[in-house]
Amino acid sequence: MTHVEVVATITPQLYIEETLIQKINHRIDAIDVLELRIDQFENVTVDQVAEMITKLKVMQDSFKLLVTYRTKLQGGYGQFTNDSYLNLISDLANINGIDMIDIEWQADIDIEKHQRIITHLQQYNKEVIISHHNFESTPPLDELQFIFFKMQKFNPEYVKLAVMPHNKNDVLNLLQAMSTFSDTMDCKVVGISMSKLGLISRTAQGVFGGALTYGCIGEPQAPGQIDVTDLKAQVTLY
């Protein structure tokens, strides 16, 4: 069984409010990684992100900071063109205080460009999570395994796959794909079966080889998320 870090997702509006800081501090013992989502801003800039990071850095000794721009194609709010999205991700490397950066994977990506950006981020000591999200369904087992395989070829620190289950077999397939990957590949793996049906994938992540599990601070930011305080308590049972 692997050690699992708990990620708390936040989606602030305009700036980091003191009430949000208080909510984070109230759950500080449950948070290993704080995920700052930035796709909710219509035209987010690197300067805006840097300002938010500065506000959060006061607490940074307590957790790592992950920055994510989730595109609309993969279930987020972000409507940047692909080029604008990749330029933003690349520019995040220059912000001190960011520990981890999420970059999305799609079957039709420019492989060489993606690899250049990932290598660039790593040269600035950013851990990379390459991720893929399917909010409609769970592909068959062999396709799940293939997606994990394709993502790990970029040599990221983490590969993350989140899918929507429609029955218990979908959940089992995701867990099996994650378990097999963790036994055979070097990089860390994250597998999420979304919604209440797939909650076990969040709470028992480490049993199946997963390294990160995502929770919320108050209102869920994705289907099936629970508050990080409850999630931490569940994860430590295994």
From Swiss-Prot:
Q: Which UniProt keywords apply?
A: Amino-acid biosynthesis, Aromatic amino acid biosynthesis, Lyase, Schiff base
An example Gene Ontology biological process? chorismate biosynthetic process
What is its pathway?
A: Metabolic intermediate biosynthesis; chorismate biosynthesis; chorismate from D-erythrose 4-phosphate and phosphoenolpyruvate: step 3/7
Report a single Gene Ontology molecular function.
3-dehydroquinate dehydratase activity
EC number(s) on file: 4.2.1.10
Q: Catalyzes what?
A: 3-dehydroquinate = 3-dehydroshikimate + H2O
**InterPro entries xrefs:** Aldolase_TIM (IPR013785), DHquinase_I (IPR001381), Type-I_3-dehydroquinase (IPR050146)
Q: Which positions does UniProt annotate for 3-dehydroquinate binding?
A: E35, L36, R37, R70, R202, Q225
Protein's UniProt keywords contain Amino-acid biosynthesis: yes
Active site positions: H133 (proton donor/acceptor), K160 (schiff-base intermediate with substrate)
UniProt record similarity statement? Belongs to the type-I 3-dehydroquinase family.
What's the stated role of this polypeptide? Involved in the third step of the chorismate pathway, which leads to the biosynthesis of aromatic amino acids. Catalyzes the cis-dehydration of 3-dehydroquinate (DHQ) and introduces the first double bond of the aromatic ring to yield 3-dehydroshikimate.
How does this polypeptide assemble, per the annotation?
Homodimer.
Q: What is this protein called?
A: 3-dehydroquinate dehydratase
